[in-house]
Every structure is written in structure tokens, then in C-alpha cells.
Amino acid sequence: MYSPVESEQGFNFKPELPTSSAYYRLLKKLRRQVGHAIRDFKMIEDGDKVMVCVSGGKDSYTLLDILLQFKRIAPINFDIVAVNLDQKQPGFPEDVLPRYMEENNIPYYILEKDTYTITKRLTPEGKTYCAVCSRLRRGSLYGFAQEIGATKVALGHHRDDIIATFFLNLFHGGSLKAMPPKLLSSDKKNILIRPLAYVEEKDIIKYADLRKFPIIPCNLCGSQENLQRAMLNEMLREWDKQYPKRLHSIFGALQNVSPSQLADRDLFDFEILDSQRELDFKDPEEMKKRLDIVNLSFAAD
């Protein structure tokens, strides 16, 4: 049994593990989905050092928790280190993540960079901070991954994030793209992985609640969520209520692309189709006879 450790904010840094059957069913489901994602996309290999980006939100806590469980039972050896970027947002509880990591014996780093001030300066008035903030955050974390010799950078995006990004690009960006489960960073120095790619957000919410993670709010900066993404997230939630299989089908479509059925000339060579056409009659004379017969039949009609 774990002994609870309380903070001044009321957080429980080392809660007792749930014992309900609902918890174990959910845990089994999450392990299966994360395991399949890791296997399908070869996310983690023997000898890897996986840097898990932890913000203090439900997604990153769940990701870290499941990966730590895999580390204990996996047939391969790999290391996990948690990294949080303290962006110096006003009101950010700086003691929460260090306490949680230490109480649970998790190797971690706290990277301190005042990106909040830079974000405020670079963001036009009336706009949300999210775009600039995420760009600065990515740059800081990816650079730090190189410093500590991480071979993989694990991010907490889940299935619903991937689908929302797909529609965001479709509706507002004029492109068919989402968040890939595995990606080479633009500077080609980091491999990014999303082990929660198959996991639904509603299951993460349930799991985080059952595990009683010390959740840190994501809106401490005072900025509101990007309006377009907020509307898409609401649309997806409504779809999930009314048509439970729809999101599953959409995510399946992202794994079942037919380039020849789209209109991207860089993705498919449409010019080669003429040379690939197979005709039933290779003898020109035979072809002419058949065409004459067809023409006569039209004339008779």
C-alpha cells in the first residue's frame, strides 16, 4: 500500500493504487492500445532513452504512468526520464511535479525557461498565446533532448488530438494531414513518438481521475484555447455521443489512405495510367472488326 503524501494545494502525490474492477479493465485496455501503437510504429527499441514530456496535465501523466509500467514488464531494456519545461507562467505551482517525481522515484529534469514573457511579446493583441507558446516549447524541449542524449521524445497526444488536427488542417489549412504517431523533427535531430495515438480522450480522463494525478491547469497563462480547435473538439465530442463508431472510422481512414483516389499529383503519378491500361484486343485488325460491329448495332437502333 502507498502512503498518501499531501501538499499545501491538497494534491496527493502518492495515492493508493485503485483496486476496483473498473480500474483494472481500463488499465488493461490502455496497456493494450499503447502496446499496439508502440509495436505498429516501432516507437521504442532496445537501448532507447525515452524523454517523456510532462506538463502536469492528464495526458502526460497517463503517458508517463503507462510507459513506466511497460518498462517494468517489457522484454527489452530502455530508460525513461520525465522532463517538464517551467515556462514561468504566473501562478504555476513549481513544487508539484518535482514532488510527484520524487515521491514515485521517477528520474526527472525541470527545464526553466521564461518563454511566457517572450510569448506575450510576440503574440498580437487579441490573439491566443497557444501558437507561439507551443513553438517555443517545442524548440526548448527538443534541444534539451539532444543535451541529455534522449533517442526518443514521447508526447502525450491521443487519438482525439490526432483527429482534431486532421479536421483543423482540412477546414482551415487546405491540407490532408494530422499528427503522425511517429515523426522525425523538422531539424532531423529527434524522433518524436505518440504512444497514446490509439487511446481515446474519455478513457484518459477516467484513468487520470482513478489514479488521482495532481493535475496542473493548462490555462495559467490566462489565454483561452484556440477558438477553431475548441469548436472542433466540441464537434468531435458531439459526434462521439450521437454516433459512437464515427471517430473510430475516421481514425481508421487515416491508416487506410488510397493515393490514387485523391488528387495530389505529388502523391500519385496520374500520367502513368495511360501506359498501364490493359486492352482486351491487342491485334489492331481484330479491334477494328469489333468496333465495326458495335457501330453497326448503333446504326440499327
Swiss-Prot record:
EC number, as in UniProt: 2.8.1.-
Subcellular localization, as worded in the UniProt entry: Cytoplasm
A Pfam family reported for this protein in Swiss-Prot or TrEMBL: ATP_bind_3
Pathway(s) where this gene product acts: tRNA modification
Keyword field: 4Fe-4S, ATP-binding, Cytoplasm, Iron, Iron-sulfur, Magnesium, Metal-binding, Nucleotide-binding, RNA-binding, Transferase, tRNA processing, tRNA-binding
SUPFAM superfamilies reported in the protein's UniProt record: Adenine nucleotide alpha hydrolases-like (SSF52402)
Highest taxon of the lineage: Bacteria
Cofactor names: Mg(2+); [4Fe-4S] cluster
InterPro entries per record: Rossmann-like_a/b/a_fold, TilS/TtcA_N, tRNA_Cyd_32_2_STrfase, tRNA_thiolation_TtcA_Ctu1
Cofactor note: Binds 1 [4Fe-4S] cluster per subunit. The cluster is chelated by three Cys residues, the fourth Fe has a free coordination site that may bind a sulfur atom transferred from the persulfide of IscS.
Reactions catalysed, as given in the entry: cytidine(32) in tRNA + S-sulfanyl-L-cysteinyl-[cysteine desulfurase] + AH2 + ATP = 2-thiocytidine(32) in tRNA + L-cysteinyl-[cysteine desulfurase] + A + AMP + diphosphate + H(+)
Positions contributing to [4Fe-4S] cluster binding: C130, C133, C221
Role summary: Catalyzes the ATP-dependent 2-thiolation of cytidine in position 32 of tRNA, to form 2-thiocytidine (s(2)C32). The sulfur atoms are provided by the cysteine/cysteine desulfurase (IscS) system.
Further information: The thiolation reaction likely consists of two steps: a first activation step by ATP to form an adenylated intermediate of the target base of tRNA, and a second nucleophilic substitution step of the sulfur (S) atom supplied by the hydrosulfide attached to the Fe-S cluster.
Protein's UniProt name: tRNA-cytidine(32) 2-sulfurtransferase
Gene: ttcA
